[in-house]
Amino acid sequence: MNPLDLIARRAYPYETEKRDRTYLALNENPFPFPEDLVDEVFRRLNSDTLKIYYDSPDEELIEKILSYLNTDFLSKSNVSVGNGADEIIYVMMLMFDRSVFFPPTYSCYRIFAKAVGAKFLEVPLTKDLRIPEVNVGEGDVVFIPNPNNPTGHVFEREEIERILKTGAFVALDEAYYEFHGESYVDLLKKYENLAVIRTFSKAFSLAAQRIGYVVSSEKFIDAYNRMRLPFNVSYVSQMFAKVALDHREIFEERTKFIVEERERMKSILRKMGYRITDSRGNFVFIFMEKEEKERLLEHLRAKNIAVRSFREGVRITIGKREENDMILKELEVFK
């Protein structure tokens, strides 16, 4: 078979809808990166540096990430960066014999596994959304988003440790950490078979810049740096991340608003009678049967509102107050 035909059969592109509507589908931050910080980025850029292959990761950025992590047991050799958290996930699928994940989960795990031709195992979460008993061990990498995407619920520390104790490598995807406020990064003191992945896309309004980071053992970081592309994160993207971390209080205040809106929406949705999760992300998740879900999606499309559809229901990104009020109104009408 022609290699291009084989790729077309096993992999498929990640597609998004047009942005000609109220868009609450991709868990993007409703607030733009502040204009004055954009100006600061460009003031700090050195035009002469643009002509060179810039260090990735930038040592100064690693120092700022370590300060943000605020631990006393991590050093520069425990941190690296990726072209978005997605690149880190993609590379990890090349590093291990088999990838394991628990749907409903981040859809790109399956997309990436198929794209790279990796062996993978999908074992659904239990009915109460807990990690099931699964036969894994050395050679496996187990991807666990915490808070989970798309449901937003949080896995217990004991669930994560149960997988770690099997000897499998755990990729703990903390893309939504800032909206939850609790991390299991301290487990790195106890387990070498753990990597914590984070992103600047969500809380820091930098999805377009494609920058994430990974924290793990020195041994893993060395292996990851050998596998990833050289110069994988641009000079400009790294500068945006450094400026964001220098002004983290701005983003912490915005995160506080998003969390308050999330809790407000959860309270209202429960009163409306919707079955929702206890989301700790920047989104809410409503369980729905297929027929009801399709009717809701049709209703929202007619109102020029886009949300994300999953087999188990719909996920709604927390937007600005007026956007949240708009979709709450339509959900009430639909109910």
Curated annotation (Swiss-Prot):
It is an enzyme of class 2 (transferase). InterPro entries: Aminotrans_II_pyridoxalP_BS, Aminotransferase_I/II_large, HisP_aminotrans, HistidinolP_aminotransfase, PyrdxlP-dep_Trfase, PyrdxlP-dep_Trfase_major, PyrdxlP-dep_Trfase_small. Its cofactor is pyridoxal 5'-phosphate. GO terms for molecular function: histidinol-phosphate transaminase activity; pyridoxal phosphate binding. Signal peptide: none annotated. Its EC number is 2.6.1.9. It holds the Pfam family Aminotran_1_2. GO terms for biological process: L-histidine biosynthetic process. Pathway: Amino-acid biosynthesis; L-histidine biosynthesis; L-histidine from 5-phospho-alpha-D-ribose 1-diphosphate: step 7/9. Keywords: Amino-acid biosynthesis, Aminotransferase, Histidine biosynthesis, Pyridoxal phosphate, Transferase. The keyword Nucleotide-binding does not apply. It catalyses: L-histidinol phosphate + 2-oxoglutarate = 3-(imidazol-4-yl)-2-oxopropyl phosphate + L-glutamate. Homodimer. This is Histidinol-phosphate aminotransferase. The gene is hisC.
